[in-house]
Protein backbone atom coordinates (compact mmCIF):
# COMPACT_ATOMS: atom_id res chain seq x y z
CA UNK A 1 0.00 0.00 0.00
CA UNK A 2 1.70 3.14 -1.20
CA UNK A 3 1.42 6.79 -0.30
CA UNK A 4 -0.99 7.38 -3.18
CA UNK A 5 -3.38 4.73 -1.87
CA UNK A 6 -3.27 6.26 1.60
CA UNK A 7 -3.92 9.75 0.19
CA UNK A 8 -6.84 8.46 -1.89
CA UNK A 9 -8.31 6.67 1.15
CA UNK A 10 -7.86 9.83 3.26
CA UNK A 11 -9.69 11.94 0.65
CA UNK A 12 -12.55 9.41 0.60
CA UNK A 13 -12.84 9.49 4.38
CA UNK A 14 -12.81 13.30 4.42
CA UNK A 15 -15.58 13.34 1.81
CA UNK A 16 -17.64 10.89 3.88
CA UNK A 17 -17.12 13.08 6.94
CA UNK A 18 -18.31 16.19 5.09
CA UNK A 19 -21.33 14.33 3.68
CA UNK A 20 -22.26 13.05 7.14
CA UNK A 21 -22.01 16.52 8.70
CA UNK A 22 -24.17 18.00 5.89
CA UNK A 23 -26.79 15.27 6.39
CA UNK A 24 -26.68 15.86 10.14
CA UNK A 25 -27.18 19.62 9.73
CA UNK A 26 -30.09 19.08 7.31
CA UNK A 27 -31.75 16.64 9.70
CA UNK A 28 -31.31 19.00 12.65
CA UNK A 29 -32.80 21.85 10.62
CA UNK A 30 -35.79 19.72 9.58
CA UNK A 31 -36.38 18.69 13.22
CA UNK A 32 -36.26 22.34 14.26
CA UNK A 33 -38.77 23.27 11.53
CA UNK A 34 -41.08 20.44 12.62
CA UNK A 35 -40.86 21.55 16.25
CA UNK A 36 -41.69 25.14 15.32
CA UNK A 37 -44.57 23.99 13.10
CA UNK A 38 -46.21 22.20 16.04
CA UNK A 39 -46.64 25.50 17.83
CA UNK A 40 -46.94 25.42 21.58
CA UNK A 41 -45.68 22.40 23.47
CA UNK A 42 -48.34 19.90 24.50
CA UNK A 43 -47.77 20.77 28.13
CA UNK A 44 -49.59 24.07 27.61
CA UNK A 45 -52.43 22.47 25.70
CA UNK A 46 -55.70 21.83 27.55
CA UNK A 47 -56.61 18.99 25.19
CA UNK A 48 -56.55 15.59 26.80
CA UNK A 49 -54.31 13.00 25.19
CA UNK A 50 -55.23 9.36 24.87
CA UNK A 51 -53.46 7.16 27.43
CA UNK A 52 -51.49 5.23 24.79
CA UNK A 53 -49.92 8.39 23.35
CA UNK A 54 -48.95 9.68 26.78
CA UNK A 55 -47.36 6.36 27.68
CA UNK A 56 -45.46 6.24 24.38
CA UNK A 57 -44.24 9.80 24.94
CA UNK A 58 -43.07 8.88 28.46
CA UNK A 59 -41.03 5.93 27.21
CA UNK A 60 -39.63 8.01 24.36
CA UNK A 61 -38.65 10.85 26.70
CA UNK A 62 -37.07 8.30 29.06
CA UNK A 63 -35.03 6.90 26.17
CA UNK A 64 -33.95 10.39 25.13
CA UNK A 65 -32.99 11.16 28.71
CA UNK A 66 -30.84 8.02 28.86
CA UNK A 67 -29.22 8.82 25.52
CA UNK A 68 -28.31 12.31 26.72
CA UNK A 69 -26.66 11.00 29.89
CA UNK A 70 -22.99 11.98 29.80
CA UNK A 71 -20.11 9.76 30.85
CA UNK A 72 -18.94 12.38 33.34
CA UNK A 73 -22.40 12.30 34.99
CA UNK A 74 -22.24 8.52 35.18
CA UNK A 75 -18.76 8.61 36.72
CA UNK A 76 -19.94 11.14 39.33
CA UNK A 77 -22.96 8.96 40.12
CA UNK A 78 -20.77 5.87 40.31
CA UNK A 79 -18.33 7.57 42.72
CA UNK A 80 -21.25 8.64 44.89
CA UNK A 81 -22.57 5.06 44.93
CA UNK A 82 -19.14 3.74 45.92
CA UNK A 83 -18.89 6.26 48.77
CA UNK A 84 -22.31 5.33 50.14
CA UNK A 85 -21.88 1.58 49.66
CA UNK A 86 -21.65 -0.21 52.98
CA UNK A 87 -19.01 -2.93 53.07
CA UNK A 88 -20.20 -6.51 53.50
CA UNK A 89 -19.53 -8.64 56.56
CA UNK A 90 -16.45 -10.23 55.00
CA UNK A 91 -14.99 -6.93 53.82
CA UNK A 92 -11.41 -5.92 54.41
CA UNK A 93 -11.05 -4.36 57.87
CA UNK A 94 -9.10 -1.43 56.41
CA UNK A 95 -12.01 -0.64 54.10
CA UNK A 96 -14.39 -1.01 57.03
CA UNK A 97 -12.34 1.41 59.13
CA UNK A 98 -12.13 3.92 56.28
CA UNK A 99 -15.87 3.65 55.68
CA UNK A 100 -16.59 4.16 59.37
CA UNK A 101 -14.31 7.18 59.58
CA UNK A 102 -15.86 8.82 56.50
CA UNK A 103 -19.35 8.06 57.79
CA UNK A 104 -18.64 9.60 61.19
CA UNK A 105 -17.16 12.74 59.61
CA UNK A 106 -20.25 13.02 57.43
CA UNK A 107 -22.47 12.63 60.51
CA UNK A 108 -20.56 15.42 62.28
CA UNK A 109 -21.21 17.72 59.34
CA UNK A 110 -24.88 16.71 59.17
CA UNK A 111 -25.40 17.37 62.87
CA UNK A 112 -24.04 20.85 62.34
CA UNK A 113 -21.14 20.40 64.74
CA UNK A 114 -18.59 21.64 62.23
CA UNK A 115 -20.85 24.11 60.45
CA UNK A 116 -20.33 27.79 61.18
CA UNK A 117 -17.19 27.40 63.27
CA UNK A 118 -14.17 29.61 62.84
CA UNK A 119 -11.08 27.62 61.94
CA UNK A 120 -7.95 27.87 64.02
CA UNK A 121 -5.60 27.95 61.08
CA UNK A 122 -2.28 29.56 60.44
CA UNK A 123 0.09 29.79 57.51
CA UNK A 124 3.38 27.95 57.92
CA UNK A 125 6.78 29.17 56.74
CA UNK A 126 6.39 27.13 53.55
CA UNK A 127 3.15 28.97 52.75
CA UNK A 128 0.79 26.08 53.52
CA UNK A 129 -2.31 26.48 55.65
CA UNK A 130 -2.06 24.51 58.90
CA UNK A 131 -5.34 23.81 60.70
CA UNK A 132 -5.33 22.97 64.37
CA UNK A 133 -7.82 20.29 65.36
CA UNK A 134 -10.45 21.28 67.87
CA UNK A 135 -10.17 18.92 70.86
CA UNK A 136 -13.93 18.61 71.38
CA UNK A 137 -14.49 17.60 67.75
CA UNK A 138 -11.67 15.06 67.93
CA UNK A 139 -13.17 13.63 71.13
CA UNK A 140 -16.64 13.40 69.57
CA UNK A 141 -15.25 11.68 66.49
CA UNK A 142 -13.21 9.24 68.59
CA UNK A 143 -16.21 8.43 70.80
CA UNK A 144 -18.46 7.86 67.78
CA UNK A 145 -15.89 5.60 66.10
CA UNK A 146 -15.36 3.60 69.31
CA UNK A 147 -19.10 3.21 69.77
CA UNK A 148 -19.50 1.98 66.19
CA UNK A 149 -16.55 -0.41 66.57
CA UNK A 150 -17.99 -1.79 69.81
CA UNK A 151 -21.43 -2.28 68.23
CA UNK A 152 -19.93 -4.07 65.22
CA UNK A 153 -17.73 -6.25 67.45
CA UNK A 154 -20.78 -7.30 69.48
CA UNK A 155 -22.70 -8.07 66.28
CA UNK A 156 -19.83 -10.24 65.01
CA UNK A 157 -19.62 -12.08 68.34
CA UNK A 158 -23.37 -12.74 68.32
CA UNK A 159 -23.18 -13.99 64.75
CA UNK A 160 -20.20 -16.22 65.58
CA UNK A 161 -22.01 -17.63 68.64
CA UNK A 162 -25.09 -18.28 66.52
CA UNK A 163 -22.97 -20.14 63.95
CA UNK A 164 -21.49 -22.35 66.65
CA UNK A 165 -18.21 -20.50 67.06
CA UNK A 166 -17.19 -20.81 63.43
CA UNK A 167 -15.35 -17.86 61.95
CA UNK A 168 -17.56 -15.87 59.58
CA UNK A 169 -15.06 -13.22 58.56
CA UNK A 170 -14.33 -13.56 54.88
CA UNK A 171 -17.34 -15.78 54.15
CA UNK A 172 -20.09 -14.54 51.91
CA UNK A 173 -22.56 -17.35 52.61
CA UNK A 174 -22.70 -20.90 53.98
CA UNK A 175 -21.44 -22.50 50.79
CA UNK A 176 -18.47 -20.13 50.73
CA UNK A 177 -17.80 -20.78 54.43
CA UNK A 178 -17.83 -24.58 53.84
CA UNK A 179 -15.41 -24.14 50.94
CA UNK A 180 -13.08 -22.01 53.10
CA UNK A 181 -13.17 -24.59 55.89
CA UNK A 182 -12.32 -27.35 53.40
CA UNK A 183 -9.41 -25.28 52.10
CA UNK A 184 -8.14 -24.77 55.65
CA UNK A 185 -8.26 -28.54 56.30
CA UNK A 186 -6.34 -29.23 53.08
CA UNK A 187 -3.66 -26.66 53.93
CA UNK A 188 -3.26 -28.15 57.41
CA UNK A 189 -2.87 -31.66 55.94
CA UNK A 190 -0.21 -30.56 53.47
CA UNK A 191 1.57 -28.44 56.05
CA UNK A 192 2.10 -31.38 58.45
Swiss-Prot record:
One Gene Ontology term, aspect cellular component: U2-type catalytic step 2 spliceosome
Primary location? nucleus
Q: Is Nucleus set as a keyword in this record?
A: yes
Tell me the leader sequence span: none
UniProt entry tagged with the keyword Hydrolase: no
Locate the region Disordered: 16-62, 76-108, 148-192
Record's keyword terms, sorted? mRNA processing, mRNA splicing, Nucleus, Spliceosome
Gene Ontology process terms (BP): mRNA splicing, via spliceosome
Q: Where in the cell is it found?
A: Nucleus
Q: Which InterPro entries match?
A: mRNA_splic_SYF2 (IPR013260)
Which residues fall in a compositionally biased region of kind Basic and acidic residues?
A: 18-41, 152-165, 174-192
Biased segments, Acidic residues type = 49-60
Role played: Involved in pre-mRNA splicing.
The family line of this record is:
Belongs to the SYF2 family.
**Partners and quaternary state?**
Associated with the spliceosome.
- The protein depicted here goes by the name Pre-mRNA-splicing factor SYF2
Q: What is the organism field in this record?
A: Eremothecium gossypii (strain ATCC 10895 / CBS 109.51 / FGSC 9923 / NRRL Y-1056)
Q: Which gene encodes it?
A: SYF2
